[in-house]
Amino acid sequence: MGRIEKSIEIGAPPEKVWELLALDRLPEWMDVLEMKSGKYISEVHTPKDKYKVGATAHIVEKRWEYDLDISESLENEMITVHSKGKYPYTITCTLKPVDDGTKLMYTSDYESKGILGKAFGKLFAGTLEKQVERALEKLKSILEK
């Protein structure tokens, strides 16, 4: 099991950062996953439904497709999503108000299956961390425009 932990301060209030944590908004900034699209497959009747526990989206990436579901959610404070598929991972984003905006703390736990998967996981851990840093910088850039 691998883990990535990163944080960034964003010059926007937690409510604005929260909006971009919706599963269908991840492709706008999360290049690390090479997402092409994200569409809710659970019922979404109101904007708040996008963040409720049990909400599920189908994600299409460059190399594969899978579903993401929300397992924890506290509006404008914390959200945890879990992937169901070939390469399982869990991402938790925690938001804390700071003087000039929001501190976002990103944690990802991912599983590399099999002997080759574990070997590649160790080799690419640094690359994954850099991709997460780039994604967080892109999120910051979008929100600070």
Q: Where do the language-model regions lie?
A:
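Short, surface-exposed coil-to-beta transition loops
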Residues: 3-5, 64-68, 88-92
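Hydrophobic ligand-binding cavity/cleft-lining segments
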Residues: 1-48
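Glycine-rich portal/gate segments that line the openings of hydrophobic small-molecule binding cavities
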Residues: 39-85, 134, 138-145
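Hydrophobic residues positioned within well-ordered beta-strands of beta-sheet architectures
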Residues: 4-6, 55-57, 91, 104-106
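Hydrophobic pocket/interface hotspot
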Residues: 17-21, 26, 57, 70, ...
